[in-house]
């Protein structure tokens, strides 16, 4: 059936366009040489000053996307609320290359929330090094 191929479309993709322009949300999209230097083809992030109003929708999108796609998942749930999550999704093929896909979601102190989507040739280790070397 056709909808099986639609799995390629992740629900979190819609969140970036939907919330990217909101007042208390910072959207970052990298392109060009920065992406290349980290072996990424896509990097998108949303940082919510207060993620609470968006939390349920983000959580639903993540649950949907991980269902058929997740190869690896790490989640921290607190009273039914997803506090932090990391997913490595099944590879996707683009222009003859198999690309890794990652979703990272985290609620920090004062309800600040971050949602990141990464696609590229980079390995899980490279991705972790890139994300956490700045901390």
Predicted segments — roles?
Residues 36-42, 55, 105-106, 114, ...:
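Helix-rich interaction surfaces within compact, conserved domain-sized segments
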Residues 1-12:
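Bacterial Sec-dependent N-terminal signal peptides
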Residues 12-16, 70, 135:
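Terminal interaction module
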Residues 123-135:
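Short, low-complexity, Pro/Ser/Thr/Gly-rich segments in the mature regions of secreted, periplasmic
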Residues 88-123:
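A short, solvent-exposed beta-edge/loop patch
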Residues 46-94:
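Mature extracytoplasmic domains of secretory-pathway proteins
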Residues 42-50, 116-118:
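Second-shell loop/turn segments in exported
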Residues 17-43:
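N-terminal targeting signals for Sec/Tat export/insertion, comprising classic cleavable signal peptides
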